A protein has these predicted regions:
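Class I SAM-dependent methyltransferase SAM/SAH-binding core
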Residues: 57-115
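A short acidic, Gly/Pro-enriched loop at the edge of an enzyme's catalytic core
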Residues: 114-125
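Core SAM-dependent methyltransferase catalytic element
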Residues: 222-247
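A short SAM/SAH-binding and catalytic strip from SAM-dependent methyltransferases
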Residues: 124-138
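A short glycine-rich, Lys/Arg-flanked "PGG" loop and its adjoining helix->strand segment in the class I
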Residues: 139-151
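Conserved beta-strand signature within the Rossmann-like core of class I S-adenosyl-L-methionine
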Residues: 153-160
Length: 247
């Protein structure tokens, strides 16, 4: 298979696009607030695992306002293609790319992770952030991400997680159920209140259905080897990375 089939949006895609459509203007500031200041540190770890290989051609999926894409371009000197469902997020991302002086090395386009419009082995590295909770079939999505990665290339991801320590898990539960919605309303209005109210239950339900062992198995089934998992900030986030096996 040299390219994905024509894109067909799912209910999960439509929900994600609607949830984030009103957020771009203050997304980056509020993402830091709602992650208790950890989003930038998590992102740095993700980028580090890709930049170590000095890839020349990188795909960043669920790129949002292009924060990861910009960091990758700066750290690697390579070209970055960013893909996201939400055009308003991409519009804000293009503003940020231009402000960073990186228009010649970063291209942002609308697209779906489940059906990427790229040929097999098109990229030296692939990153994705906060993605799998918004797709219908995480395993198939991981396989599609691996399809466009060249053999030997790095696949890396970042997402929220649920702490395993009981005390930290209780604190996380209170933070995601009470603090996040209130902080979202206080700093970002109704749109961010919706996101704050949604995130905690969504994260919990996703990892009940898709524990890390199952996610790692999906990476391996897609041909990714040497998969590593690094919980961040006492388990509030998780970074994963691995390499596509050579044929």
């Amino acid at each position: 298979m040299n390219a994905a089939r024509p894109s067909t949006a799912t209910a999960e895609n439509a929900f994600a696009a609607d949830l984030f459509a009103g957020l771009p203007k203050r997304y980056d500031l509020l993402a830091e607030i709602l992650s208790f200041g950890q989003n930038g540190r998590w992102r740095w770890r993700l980028v580090t695992h890709i930049a170590a290989d000095e890839p020349k051609k990188i795909l960043d999926v669920a790129t949002g306002t292009a924060g990861v894409a910009i960091a990758l371009a700066r750290r690697t000197g390579g070209s970055v293609t960013g893909v996201d469902l939400t055009e308003s997020m991409l519009a804000r991302g293009r503003e940020r790319v231009s402000a960073a002086g990186l228009d010649d090395r970063i291209n942002l386009q609308t697209g779906r992770a489940e059906e990427l419009p790229f040929s097999n082995a098109s990229f030296d590295a692939v990153s994705f952030t906060y993605l799998l909770r918004y797709v219908n079939d995480p395993a198939a999505t991981i396989a599609e991400l691996a399809r466009v990665l060249r053999p030997g290339g790095v696949l890396a991801s970042l997402d929220f997680f649920v702490p395993t320590n009981p005390a930290w898990r209780a604190a996380w539960w209170f933070y995601t159920r009470a603090v996040l919605p209130a902080a979202g309303m206080a700093f970002g209005g109704t749109e961010w209140w919706r996101v704050g109210r949604f995130l905690g239950p969504n994260i919990s339900s996703f990892y009940r259905a898709w524990p890390l062992t199952r996610i790692v198995a999906a990476w391996e089934a897609a041909g990714i080897v040497d998969v590593r998992v690094s919980p961040m900030s006492v388990g509030g986030g998780v970074v994963m990375w691995g390499r596509k096996a050579h044929a």
